Amino acid sequence: TVKINDDYELGQQMYIWEMATAVAAHFMGVNPFDQPDVEATKKHTRAVIADLDKRGELADEKPAITFEQAEIFGNINGATPADVIRNFMKQAKAGDYICLQVFLIPSQETNEAVNSLRKVLACQYTLPVACGYGPRYLHSTGQLHKGDAGNGLFIQLTQDFSLDVDVPDSIGEEKSFLTFSALKAAQAKGDRQALTEAGRRIIRIHFKKNPVDGLKTIVNGL
């Protein structure tokens, strides 16, 4: 156990572990500063944004299945969203892990609903379940998702955003073709494309209504 006495010691610990990571990576023959698979997502995201600039809107994706609460994207089928997840998890094998990519509005309710889904999946399939909010996970575990041995089963959770803010085209300008919600959607799509390109198994569940209610329905169905 490391005892932290003040804010400065916290900074010292961060530096120590950054150095430890670099030293360990050196002896493992790994470049700790290389992130080729993070760049793969950025490349796809830039292409999505460029297409948005040209079209004036994000290109539509056709869902595989449409339910009252959610739309499902991916090569999958099922009678309910919970059934979709069960069918998706039939691919699971020893040594795999599940990853929830959460592109939802963070809140205490959302955290609890996502955590309930994580616990149910971990118990039912006896596999580790990673969970991260997008887009912030992209620069950390996002590298692992596309650069590992391909053991992940990815469930991406998205929603529409009622409140939005424009992103100015350049500093000091009011003109904007991009909003923060569109940027977030582009990042989710870009990572999904990068994962698919890398041969990873992924489905997307897009909540048309309250995602917390949708997650609770899935958990109850599982």
Where are these regions (language model features)?
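Phosphate-moiety recognition in structured ligand-binding domains
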Residues: T1-L222
